[in-house]
Amino acid sequence: MKKLISWNVNGLRAVMGKNFMEDFKRLDADIFCLQETKLQEGQIDLDLPDYFQYWNYAVKKGYSGTAIFTKDEPLSVQYGIGIEEHDQEGRVITLEFPEFYLITVYVPNSQGELKRLPYRMEFEDAFLNYILSLEKKKPVIYCGDLNVAHEEIDLKNPDTNHMSAGFSDEERAKFSRVLDSGYLDSFRHFYPDKEEEYSWWSYRTKARDRNVGWRIDYFVVSKQLEKKLLSASIHQEVMGSDHCPVEITLDL
């Protein structure tokens, strides 16, 4: 069995002072993916002797960034999706393993008044093309902060957020297209009707205390691996970021 964890840490240096290493050891994942590390190369040295470490950094300092820590050494590693326009912000890492590709992604936020939505749509199209090109070789699992609540059940206040970044019709439609292309939202695969299961809460309104949240962190799994998928969960008990970790286990 393999346990995979994904967590948007909203700044790894900040979360290091909030029990990150204790949480990391307790969760004991075979593969641990991070988004929004907000680091440049050499700014942090994590002592993880049981893990191979892979980091992708944004050109812009203190922004975006991803990392993957894995107990099994991958066959190959790719940073970005091979399109320069989309590879400036350290948003994607791909590891190839014998039975699957594992990708972590930090999808661009469409921002206030949806001012970055046009770029977001371009990124979504390019990313889907990328995973489908890999899928021709072996099944794909991707995880991360996808910056979209797919259905109304995936956020506390859908009625007031239809024009908000993360719940626009355009963003939701792009995610539907991914699922229609042969992928599973792993959490909804097991819990199609479970309510108030969120992975992000705004800092501004003490939303986490009241569980006024959004589920925007996912493991998306190729339908080729459906029978291998054992469980999916959300670790709302883990603090330190405005997001919490999400998990799947696989019979691999």
Show where each model-derived region lies.
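N-terminal, active-site-proximal structural segment of metallo-dependent hydrolase catalytic domains
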Residues: M1-L48, F52, A58, Y63-S64, ...
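Active-site-proximal beta-strand elements of phosphoester/diester hydrolases
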Residues: K2-N10, E99-Q111, C143
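Active-site beta-strand/loop signature of hydrolases that rely on acidic residues for catalysis
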Residues: N8, F24-G42, L102, I131-E152, ...
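Metal-dependent phosphoesterases centered on the DNase I-like endonuclease/exonuclease/phosphatase
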Residues: I31, F52, D125-V212, I216
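Structured beta-strand-rich core segments of catalytic domains in phosphoester-bond hydrolases
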Residues: K38, Q43-S110
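Conserved beta strand-loop-helix elements of the APE1-like EEP
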Residues: K61-S76, T205-K227
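Active-site beta-strand termini and strand-to-loop segments that position acidic
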Residues: K71, L95-P98, S222-K223, I248-L252
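Surface-exposed cleft-lining segments at the edges of enzyme active sites
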Residues: G82-I83, P108-E124, D159-S164
